[in-house]
Amino acid sequence: DTMIASFLTDHTPTIIPAADTPAAQLTVAQTDWSMRLSAPMSAELKDVLAPTLETYKLSITHLNNFLDVSRGGPQNFLLNNLLRFPSAKSPAASYGTAIHASLQQLHNLLRADHRLPPTERILNYFRTSLEAQYLPPDDFALYLDKGTAALTAFLDAKSSDFHDTELAELDFAHQGVVVGGARLTGKLDVADIDKHNKTIFVTDYKTGKPSHSWKGTSDYEKIKLHKYRQQLMFYQLLVKSSRDYGNFTFAGARLQFVEPDMKTGDILSLEDTFSREELAEFARLIGVVWRKITALELPDISGYSADYRGMVQFEEDLLTEVE
């Protein structure tokens, strides 16, 4: 017999046709879970989540997951970020982890030795980091070649742009950041900190296809860039509301793409600055989402299209709610 988690027993089971293929079985499972989690939240589920919410801090990844209606929005957030159901890490995500670890190592060595390490040393570190992801042999070979080529091109083009004042993986978990009533946390890939002039500039590394502008051409790219831009705003709020860096001037933020452009071979980056009004509105959005999360009042997104337009509309509707 199938055992149902006790906090889901209030949900009336829906009979779904049997599935014969793995793909069909996955679809059935996803549909069934979506229906269960879209039902009104039981008191027992709220009790299960209460200890988590007592110490919960909102990260930009969790915020993005809550807002992205193209990927399930609040229900996806509940399943993956609050209930923390296990999910397989994709080969692309494993590749991204290895690239980030390699660049973190570069910054750590530069900060310690005050000179750039040889490219070969970083490439060896990348291989070791990728091996630690335990990819299938074909995926490992594919991403080893891809990452080696990308890092070689990136380090060749950007070697003069690295500084020993840059701090990798600056963690704000214990900085006491509260924005819009929400406890926030996060790590900055790179923070260039000028203690004399009290300025801080943030760089976030991105793997994958680079973008030439903030506009985006496809719906997928528009959603991706929308999230990226919110990520940089989130980091500015983290810095300005933190214990140690609140009195620093936020000098700017950059998305630094690691992989070269397919057509030109150029290494691209996107920078942006945000107005006081834009940051205030984003902080208000964070506050609304925080209250939804902590009250476990997850909005029904069935009326929104699963695309960029639906995501923007969802955010606008959240902002219009009475605080």
Features from the language model and the residues they span:
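C-terminal, charged and often intrinsically disordered regions of DNA end-processing helicases
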Residues: M3-L109, S305-E323
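Metal-dependent nuclease catalytic regions and adjoining charged, substrate-binding loops involved
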Residues: T12-V28, Q236-E323
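A non-catalytic, helix-rich entry segment at domain boundaries
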Residues: S102-V178, I267-E277, W290, F314-E323
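Generic recognition of stable, solvent-exposed alpha-helical segments in well-folded globular domains
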Residues: T2-S6, L58-T61, G73-F77, S90, ...
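Secondary-structure transition/capping motifs at alpha-helix termini
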Residues: L109, A157-F162, D194-K198, S242-F248
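Non-catalytic protein-protein interaction segments used by genome-maintenance enzymes to assemble
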Residues: L167-S242
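Glycine- and acidic
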Residues: T61-H62, L79-K89, L110-R111, T128-D138, ...
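Active-site-adjacent bridging/hinge elements
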Residues: V69-L79, R121-L123, T199-S213, F257
